Amino acid sequence: MVREEVAGSTQTLQWKCVESRVDSKRLYYGRFILSPLRKGQADTVGIALRRALLGEIEGTCITRAKFWSVPHEYSTIAGIEESVQEILLNLKEIVLRSNLYGVRDASICVKGPKYITAQDIILPPSVEIVDTAQPIANLTEPIDFCIDLQIKRDRGYQTELIKNYQDGSYPIDAVSMPVRNVNYSIFSCGNGNEKHEILFLEIWTNGSLTPKEALYEASRNLIDLFLPFLHAEEEGTSFEENKNRFTPPLFTFQKRLTNLKKNKKGIPLNCIFIDQLELTSRTXNCLKRANIHTLLDLLSKTEEDLLRIDSFRMEDRKHIWDTLEKHLPIDLLKNKLSF
């Protein structure tokens, strides 16, 4: 963080992107400005955004690779220059772009001699490779080479203690951090009591999203963190009152699910996707992260299951219920899902 004195003027608080460039397929850069801020506010915003950008942005990466007839990760395979460990390290570096949630399967199946790159990965339709030229392995002989892969969207650095399994499946210490680096600097402007601060924010990403997209997602995450305090203030209620207000369950899950399955309307619950329910993007993303994709998946969960979902709030329960009330037949809700 750098602090400098510059000349400036007082205006309504605003932000804009002052520089944006693509250095390579896996390196995007953006520079943003926020001003004018009162003394001390730039540090507050800068620290919060930097931490949110580095730790809260989700990324998609390869988390597991399965080799056939390989005893351990330090093995070498005849006809391949790289060892298994080197191939795993190369797979770890592959940058993917996707909005998928849950685990997806991918694979590599080629015949040598061939220089294998990220372009040779067979991916599900929802996943895209950022840089198809990223190296994986070099086959020097006419051999068949196949790997089964698992892909997952997550955040932060994920590591597993168990490094190898008897079936040839090896976990990859996934780095789900699309933001490579963040730097901010503060400039003071004005004189005397009219002094204000200008915040400059620099963001570098790996190409799976732009710095502007990363800044938007980080800002939304920070807003979501403070929303409960805002609601408590507006409604004039304490946390204990909020807790008591949400104590009655919004679903009698298993019982209601059974009733729904038996209802005369014959609603195909497994064919109604949560994307069709007009949930907010935040609530829908929370559910998808927990592999809840259909109405059947949702109603199969208990209240405790939902509250264990990362970032799922008590307010989300009410929002889900209001949405179900809107989209399902009114008589069905009254007769089968009443509480």
From Swiss-Prot:
**Annotated Gene Ontology cellular component terms:** chloroplast; DNA-directed RNA polymerase complex; mitochondrion
Q: Where is this region: Alpha N-terminal domain (alpha-NTD)?
A: 1-233
Location comes to: Plastid, Chloroplast
Query: Pfam families of this UniProt entry?
Result: RNA_pol_A_bac (PF01000), RNA_pol_A_CTD (PF03118), RNA_pol_L (PF01193)
Primary localization = plastid
Q: Which reaction does it catalyse?
A: RNA(n) + a ribonucleoside 5'-triphosphate = RNA(n+1) + diphosphate
Q: Which domain of life is it from?
A: Eukaryota
Q: What is its EC number?
A: 2.7.7.6
Q: Which SUPFAM superfamilies match?
A: C-terminal domain of RNA polymerase alpha subunit, Insert subdomain of RNA polymerase alpha subunit, RBP11-like subunits of RNA polymerase
Coiled-coil positions are none
Where do the record's region annotations for Alpha C-terminal domain (alpha-CTD) lie? 264-339
EC supergroup of this enzyme: transferase
Q: Which GO terms describe its biological process?
A: DNA-templated transcription
- Gene3D superfamilies to which the protein is assigned, alphabetical: 5' to 3' exonuclease, C-terminal subdomain (1.10.150.20), DNA-directed RNA polymerase, insert domain (2.170.120.12), RNA polymerase, RBP11-like subunit (3.30.1360.10)
Where does the UniProt annotation place the signal sequence?
Answer: none
Keywords assigned by UniProt, alphabetized? Chloroplast, DNA-directed RNA polymerase, Nucleotidyltransferase, Plastid, Transcription, Transferase
The job of this chain, per UniProt, is described as: DNA-dependent RNA polymerase catalyzes the transcription of DNA into RNA using the four ribonucleoside triphosphates as substrates.
So what family is this one in? Belongs to the RNA polymerase alpha chain family.
Subunit description: In plastids the minimal PEP RNA polymerase catalytic core is composed of four subunits: alpha, beta, beta', and beta''. When a (nuclear-encoded) sigma factor is associated with the core the holoenzyme is formed, which can initiate transcription.
Q: NCBIfam families of this UniProt entry?
A: rpoA
Name of the protein in question: DNA-directed RNA polymerase subunit alpha
| Gene source species | Heteranthelium piliferum
Gene that encodes it = rpoA
